[in-house]
From Swiss-Prot:
SUPFAM superfamilies named among the record's database cross-references: S-adenosyl-L-methionine-dependent methyltransferases
GO annotation, biological process: methylation; tRNA processing
GO molecular function: nucleic acid binding; tRNA (adenine-N6)-methyltransferase activity
Alphabetical UniProt keywords: Cytoplasm, Methyltransferase, S-adenosyl-L-methionine, Transferase, tRNA processing
Protein name (database record): tRNA1(Val) (adenine(37)-N6)-methyltransferase
Catalytic reaction equation(s): adenosine(37) in tRNA1(Val) + S-adenosyl-L-methionine = N(6)-methyladenosine(37) in tRNA1(Val) + S-adenosyl-L-homocysteine + H(+)
A Pfam family that the UniProt record links to this protein: MTS
Subcellular location: Cytoplasm
EC number(s) recorded for this UniProt protein: 2.1.1.223
Transmembrane segments: none
Keyword tRNA processing: yes
Length: 237
């Protein structure tokens, strides 16, 4: 049985009640997202609260951690309460579509999401895990429409998605007036094609700066660039 919690340098994330556990995608999103000058941050689909906690560690912004699943929201709230930043992070248990419609007068400097990514794969009997993994609960179109309503004029939206969804996601984003400014191609082992990508979007059309990140040089041996990006979080970096 896997550990029921993951220990970081400044906080602990319990994930035994959450469908999706602490993983590389969330850590990369929390470490790579630009948060300079952010006063208000929205984390869509916070799960365990990992990304919200990482962003709170990196800046002094107030953070809304939004989660549709009640059990996950409760565990996120517990993780956040135990952290040094409990007073700056609020967990809201609500469907993002409802939240974006009711709160479109609120604007966020930074919005992040590690959205569900399976579109047509077979589902498992666990409804909580299906919600966390399958995007029929929140499509990319619905996600990006809501983001365009809530993002401040000079704000940044950063997302982690499968590499094969990158082009279609950018097309949908552009239909909502959002354009890529930075893109990170994540390579898990030398010589392999990227399977994940992180993209930052703004309302400003510009050249997109593309970067590559190799996470491991061999099994359980992290690359220097991955260590540099995540050393403020992982215990043994």
């Amino acid at each position: 049985m896997s550990q029921p919690f993951f220990q970081f340098k400044q906080f602990t994330v319990w994930h035994d009640k959450c469908a999706m556990k602490v993983g590389t995608d969330g850590v990369l999103l929390g470490a790579w997202t630009p948060v300079e000058s952010s006063a208000r941050i929205l984390d869509i689909g916070t799960g365990t609260g990992l990304v919200a906690l990482m962003l709170a560690q990196r800046c002094s912004a107030s953070v809304i951690a939004l989660e549709i699943d009640g059990t996950a929201a409760q565990q996120a709230a517990e993780n956040i309460t135990r952290s040094p930043w409990g007073s700056r992070i609020e967990v809201v248990c609500q469907d993002f579509r409802l939240y974006s419609n009711k709160n479109n007068s609120l604007k966020y400097d930074t919005i992040v999401s590690n959205p569900p990514y399976f579109t047509d794969s077979l589902k498992c009997p666990d409804s909580q895990r299906n919600t966390a993994r399958h995007n029929d609960n929140l499509s990319y179109e619905e996600l990006l429409k809501g983001v365009s309503n809530l993002l401040s004029p000079n704000g940044t939206f950063t997302v982690v998605i499968p590499m094969d969804a990158s082009d279609s996601f950018k097309d949908i984003a552009s239909s909502q007036g959002l354009y890529p400014s930075r893109q990170l191609l994540v390579i898990t082992k030398p010589g392999a094609p990227p399977k994940r990508t992180l993209i930052s979007f703004t309302f400003i059309k510009q050249d997109c700066k593309e970067e590559k990140l190799l996470t491991e040089v061999s099994r359980h041996r992290y690359s220097d660039e991955y260590i540099k990006l995540t050393r403020e979080f992982y215990l043994k970096m």
